[in-house]
C-alpha cells in the first residue's frame, strides 16, 4: 500500500523500533455503506498516530489518516459515514503528558471534516489518561468513557455533566487501573439475556 515510510520515519532516532506500529484496537465493520463494506476492519496504530481501514478480502488498505489525533486508542463506527477516535492527545516531545485533556474526535467521511463534540466536558472533568482509554457514544448522545490510567469510568452528557462515575479504589485507598470496560444499552442487554436464556447446553 506504499505506506512503508510510516513504519520507520527518516530521522526518528527516538522511536520504539521494537514496536513501530503498536496496533491497539480493531473495529470490524458490520454493515455496508458508501465508504466501507461489511467485513472491513478499522485499525488504530498508536505509535504513528494512524487510523486505517483495511479490507481483508483484497488485502488492501483502502483509507488511512495520520492525526490530528496523537497516540490514539479505540476506533468506533458511529453510523454509515462517521467514526469516533479516542484521542489521548499525549505530548511525548518534551514531557510525556496529556495536553489539556483527552478528547473524542469524530471524522466525517462525507464532508472530510473532523470535530470534537465533547471537548468542553473532557476539559471540565479533567479526563486525561496518558495511555489506553476508550469511549462509546450512546444512542441519546451521552458518552461512556474509561479513563484507564486513573481508574475511572463515567457517563457524561453533551454539556459535560457527569451523570455517574465509578473510581476503582480499593480498601487500601489506592486507585487501580480499569481495563476494557463495557457499557450495554438496554436493548442490547435484553437481547443478550434473551439469547442466553434460550441456549440449550445439553
Across the structure, where does each feature detected by a protein language model lie?
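Histidine-/acidic-rich catalytic cores in large beta-rich domains
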Residues: 1-202
